[in-house]
Every structure is written in C-alpha cells, then in structure tokens.
C-alpha cells in the first residue's frame, strides 16, 4: 500500500509523515488538533515492514475518523480499532487491485 503524504478527514487536512521513531515506541499516532499522522520507521530495534506501515496508517486513520465522529470510547478501544482497521486494509487493497486491472 502506498501511503499518501496528505489525507482529509472530515474536511480537515492531515499531513502524513514517516519518522524514524515515535515517542513511547508507538507504531503510529494521529493528532487532529495539529493535523498530523505519524508512522514510525523503527519500532524498538526493528524496522517496520511496508505492510505493517500500511496497516498502521489505516489504524491511525480509523482513530481519526472515530475521533472526528465524537466516538472517543470506540477510538480508545484498541481491540475494536485493530480489528476494524485490519478488515479495511483487505477491502482497500482489493479496490486498488481491481482499479489497476482496468
């Protein structure tokens, strides 16, 4: 999955950055207030592979969508966010694949 440099969530521009490391050794984080979504290149001593970065990107987008909707409780439920994001990744990849075949 190619990760874009910028996305929009609820009319708000969000800049997407790949950084070497994030605070507290997180894989990713989104801050709607600052309009930033960051993805870690390195997690502890391991490089995050491309598919993991793609999954992290969608995971953070799900947080951003839920926060924009005012669904703070759902957004703080990592089990829900992980499951929902992993299901979305599969659908998104199939859509991209179908569009490339045209």
Task: Give the positions of each predicted feature.
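Short, Lys/Arg-rich amphipathic alpha-helical interaction segments
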Residues: 94-102
């Amino acid at each position: 999955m190619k990760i874009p440099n910028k996305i929009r969530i609820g009319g708000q521009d969000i800049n997407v950055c790949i950084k070497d490391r994030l605070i507290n050794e997180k894989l990713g984080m989104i801050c709607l207030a600052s309009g930033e979504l960051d993805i870690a290149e390195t997690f502890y001593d391991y490089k995050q592979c491309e598919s993991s970065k793609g999954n992290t990107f969608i995971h953070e987008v799900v947080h951003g969508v839920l926060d924009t909707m005012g669904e703070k409780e759902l957004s703080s439920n990592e089990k829900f966010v992980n499951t929902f994001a992993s299901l979305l990744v599969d659908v998104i990849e199939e859509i991209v694949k179908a569009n490339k075949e045209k």
